Swiss-Prot record:
Coiled-coil annotated residue ranges, if any: none
Lineage: Bacteria, Bacillati, Bacillota, Bacilli, Bacillales
Function: Endonuclease that is involved in the suppression of homologous recombination and thus may have a key role in the control of bacterial genetic diversity.
Name of the featured protein: Endonuclease MutS2
GO molecular-function term, one example from the UniProt record: mismatched DNA binding
Domain of life per record: Bacteria
Annotated organism of origin: Bacillus velezensis (strain DSM 23117 / BGSC 10A6 / LMG 26770 / FZB42) (Bacillus amyloliquefaciens subsp. plantarum)
Length: 785
């Protein structure tokens, strides 16, 4: 696909928008290389990946990308034997941790039954290198400093360094405390010059201390001298520092060699994490744009529902339905300039390119997009100064090139076709060019302000006229696309509303041909009919959606009711079975005891017979009651709505709602409503008398104890955001108008995550960092709705 077309449709600006959602420079790099694909299966795979990432975000909020940095140059240096720096090892350790975290995160999602096969496949390519990560962490801290315990030798050297340094300082400080020091020294401090300890001596007392001058003040009045008394001590200190440097070099070289053994695995991890960042950035962009996954086809059919231009402010952009490639393969949008025709044309082109680049598009669910081998566009004033071409010539050169390469698998966009020359000749050329492209069966969207093209779509099969609606009341375009209705200039109406005298307008109308006036009247009538039809269709669609939702809700209620009923029946049967088993066990025990007495040839004693009879009686009635519940109501009591009853089948209490038949009632049991036969009901008590007092709904309010602050310090990022979500809900229930969230200052990652969550939370009115007395930027104050 030509770069010129991508630029004219401003695809590069879309990519810039998406890069803002990447978690790393690696992700941004891959996003900037994004380009449209032409293989349907590849496109579908990328769209599905974004869909899976969106599902992960809905369920978990985000994926863990902390620690993902670009260490590819360090890996290349390790391969050729260059020793890596402590800072580079810190970044490498962070990356290895990120690999481990991501692998565990995706694994946990799949174990929980979340279907993300494509993302799972990427995660399975990650290679964890726990031994290398632990080795690096045992030698280098998070700030890139080599730890004392990186080796026994380094620990010993640093112990010696601290001892020597302490001796040097003690000796110098004793010099500073001497009685003559205040006279001879510029300041009573120990400082460092050329990595050696020195004291500031006044110029005139240089000879009093001897030793080595390492530096001079800018005025020359002060000399920074290493006194002779500590030269040998400083030399010993320097020798120890050389040993420290050599040991650190040895440790870093060892770590570099171990890293070099795994550069291929690490490079693969970098590539996989880059791809995952790329996918999740596209998903975050889709969420921000309220974009959906388009249904892709290779048949050249486009149906965009409520399509919106992604580069226009989302609170101002007008959504349009655009269909192409079904009953008609060419659309010609006519009407005056500045009417929004070009925006519609660019929306179609840009959304097609976005879909082919594996991006979700800003359009409603169910939108369909086609895969084209090429998208051609002739948009805007592209005259070439270098070639000394006029606007018309420049456009014509572009059109000639399009005609050479266009095919049935092309999408062609013409903006103001035929403009820049004599109107009659331009209109004739426009129709001829459209005919030529239409014959190739390419998909075409063209805009023009030539009135001659208004009738173009009426006498050509597969061509449809369209226009952009103009509001006469406000004298401005609504940017609403009207398929099947050609455009008109509205010049007379606009002039009348702006105050042009009526006799001038009347004379102008008389200059127009009768045929032209009839066409304008026909178009006006079509516009009204189209608007009325759209309103009726919108109302019908709204009713249909409401009916579908109601039907779905009812089906769900039936499923839940049946599930509850089955559960209650199962519990009742289980209880009955348990009682039966207990009775049978008791009976068997009694029989065994009686048989034992008989086998011993003993006569039955009276108390033994009485006891056995009693135990049988205790066991059997319980079973019989459970098997044969009394299924009758009070004979002398007439049931009425509101009565509390017992449903004998389930042994559950309920309230009567209404009588549905001669011997049948609707009963409310908890959250369930069901029909029950009257014989299965037992009256418990009458309906309470209605109270005249106003009903009070009990909700959790200010007595519900929730702290006014939430401390997140020390929490992991994911756990912290989850706690914030729950805390805000609890705080609202508790009636708190304002709460504080303590996240600390740190690296700022948690603070940013909290701020981003608060921006979109339904219960948050506003948020700000704390004042000086409230904790500053380490605390966020939240005003609740």
């Amino acid at each position: 696909m030509q770069q010129k077309v991508l630029s004219s449709l401003e695809f590069h600006k879309v990519k810039e928008q998406i890069t803002a959602h990447a978690a790393s420079s690696l992700g941004r790099e891959k996003l900037l290389q994004l380009k449209p694909l032409t293989d349907l299966s590849d496109i579908q795979k990328q769209l599905d990946e974004v869909e899976e990432a969106s599902a992960v975000m809905r369920l978990r909020g985000h994926a863990p990308f902390g620690g993902l940095t670009d260490i590819r140059s360090a890996l290349r240096r390790a391969e050729i034997g260059s020793v890596l720096t402590p800072a580079e090892f810190t970044e490498l350790s962070g990356l290895l941790y990120a690999v481990k975290q991501m692998k565990h995160f995706i694994s946990q999602m799949t174990e929980d039954g979340v279907g993300i096969p494509l993302i799972q496949a990427h995660a399975e390519e990650l290679i964890t290198l726990g031994d290398l990560e632990r080795e690096i962490n045992s030698c280098i801290d998070d700030h890139g400093e080599v730890l004392d315990h990186a080796s026994p030798a380094l620990r010993g050297i640093r112990t010696q360094l601290r001892t020597l340094e302490s001796r040097v300082r003690d000796r110098l400080e004793s010099m500073l405390r001497s009685s003559s020091a205040s006279k001879m020294l510029s300041d009573t401090i120990v400082t460092i010059r050329n990595d050696r300890f020195v004291i500031p001596v006044k110029q005139e007392y240089r000879s009093s201390y001897g030793g080595i001058v390492h530096d001079t003040s800018s005025s020359g009045a002060t000399l920074f001298i290493e006194p002779q008394a500590i030269v040998d001590m400083n030399n010993s200190l320097q020798q120890a520092k050389v040993k420290e440097k050599q040991e650190i070099e040895r440790i870093l070289r060892m770590l570099t060699e171990h890293t070099a053994e795994h550069t291929q695995e690490i490079a693969q991890d970098v590539e996989v994490l880059q791809t995952l960042d790329f996918i999740f950035a596209k998903a975050r962009y889709a969420k921000a744009m309220k974009a959906t996954k388009p249904l892709m086809n290779g048949d050249g059919f486009i149906r965009l529902k409520k399509a919106r231009h992604p580069l226009l402010p989302q609170d101002q952009v007008v959504a349009n339905d655009i269909e192409l490639g079904g009953d008609y393969s060419t659309i010609v949008i006519t009407g005056p300039n500045t009417g929004g025709k070009t925006v519609t044309l660019k929306t179609l082109g840009l959304l097609t390119i976005m879909a082919q680049a594996g991006l979700h598009i800003p359009a409603d669910e169910g939108s369909e997009a086609a895969v084209f081998d090429n998208v051609f566009a002739d948009i805007g004033d592209e005259q070439s100064i270098e070639q000394s071409l006029s606007t018309f010539s420049s456009h014509m050169v572009n059109i000639v090139n399009i005609l050479k390469d266009v095919s049935e698998n092309s999408l062609v966009l013409f903006d103001e076709l035929g403009a820049g020359t004599d109107p009659q000749e331009g209109a004739a050329l426009a129709m001829s060019i459209l005919d030529e492209v239409h014959r190739t069966n390419a998909r075409v969207l063209a805009t023009t302000h030539y009135p001659e093209l208004k009738a173009y779509g009426y006498n050509r099969q597969g061509v449809m006229n369209a226009s952009v609606e103009f509001d006469i009341e406000t004298l401005s375009p609504t940017y609403k696309l009207l398929i099947g209705v050609p455009g008109r200039s509205n010049a007379f109406e606009i002039s009348r509303r702006l105050g042009l005298p009526e006799h001038i307008i009347g004379q102008a109308k008389s200059e127009m041909t009768a045929e032209h006036n009839e066409v304008d009247l026909m178009i006006a009538s079509l516009e009204k009919s189209k608007k009325r039809a759209d309103e009726e269709l919108s109302e019908t669609e709204s009713i249909r959606k409401e009916a579908e939702k109601l039907h779905k809700d009812l089906q769900q209620q039936i499923i839940e009711l049946n599930a509850q009923k089955d559960k209650m029946m199962e519990e009742a049967e289980q209880k009955a079975a348990e009682k039966l088993e207990a009775a049978a066990n008791e009976a068997e025990q009694i029989i065994r005891e009686l048989r034992s007495i008989k086998q011993e040839h003993r006569s039955f004693k009276e108390h033994e017979l009485i006891d056995a009879k009693k135990r049988l009686g205790d066991a059997m009635p319980a079973f019989e009651k459970s098997k044969q519940p009394e299924r009758k109501t009070e004979k002398k009591r007439e049931l009425k709505p509101g009565d509390e009853v017992k449903v004998l089948t389930f042994g559950q209490k309920g309230a009567l709602l209404e009588k549905t038949g001669e011997k049948e009632w609707n009963v409310q049991i908890g959250i369930l409503k069901m029909k029950v036969k009257e014989k299965d009901l037992e009256f418990l008590k009458s309906a309470p008398e209605p109270k005249k007092e106003k009903a009070i709904t009990a909700v959790k309010g200010k007595d519900y104890h929730v702290s006014l602050e939430l401390d997140l310090r020390g929490e992991r990022y994911e756990n912290a955001l989850s706690r914030v979500e729950k805390y805000l809900d609890d705080a609202v229930l508790a009636g708190h108008p304002r709460v504080s969230i303590i996240h600390g200052k740190g690296t700022g990652a948690l603070r940013k995550g909290v701020q981003d969550l608060l921006k979109n939370h339904r219960s948050v009115k506003s948020s700000r960092f704390g004042e000086a007395g409230e904790g500053g930027s380490g605390v966020t104050i939240v005003e609740l709705k």
